[in-house]
Amino acid sequence: MKSSNLMNGYFNSHWPVECGGNRRQKIFYGSLNVANKTHHLTTKTNNRWNVMFIFRDNNEVYLTGTMPNFLGDKPFGWVKKVNPDNLETICESPNLECGEHIWCGAIAAHVNGTIINVNGSYMHVLDENCNILKEIKLPVDQAHNGLLILSDGSVVTKDIRVSNSVTSTLTRLNPESGELIGQPLKLPEGSMGRIACDIDDTGEYIYCLLYTSPSPRDPSI
């Protein structure tokens, strides 16, 4: 089931965020238009950590990732707009600061037309040509791997913890100014998985996979 309210914060696209939407159902809305078509495989190698594709407008495909620099050169995040037919780069962002944290990050197409990217301990707001509009240092100095846009357009992200020795935190931000909306919410445990979201008549809910227990179903989150 598709909820129009749940996706109000995203660009009007069939795949504006990882897994296609906040419920992470990986459902494609509309026709794939593959009947009577010929299969064609294109492979590109760039020696980078390629994380995910999203779609913005028709035939606007964006790829995000980071660098697998666990040793040696300082790592950085990046976003590029690619040709959907041959995967050639149309435009690419400058190197995106990640606070020297290496993890896969996330990307989304916002309803205001911008591209939101979270990588390491930074969030970047980019225009459709991958130019940096705003760089935001997140309040938690840790790699982040969760990114959702809520129905009001605000952005929520979560830091990742590879063990339960330190708790994770949910941070909500204004997509225009980059300012915090409320104080970051410290979860009761660490969380390695990504976050999901759903909405009903009583509120909008964020779900976090914790190490030993599920997150509370609390609309104040």
Where in this protein do the model-derived segments appear?
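Single conserved hydrophobic/aromatic residue that forms the stacking wall/gate
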Residues: 211-214, 218-221
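Repeated scaffold domains used in trafficking and secretory/extracellular systems
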Residues: 48-53, 100-107, 140-149, 190-198
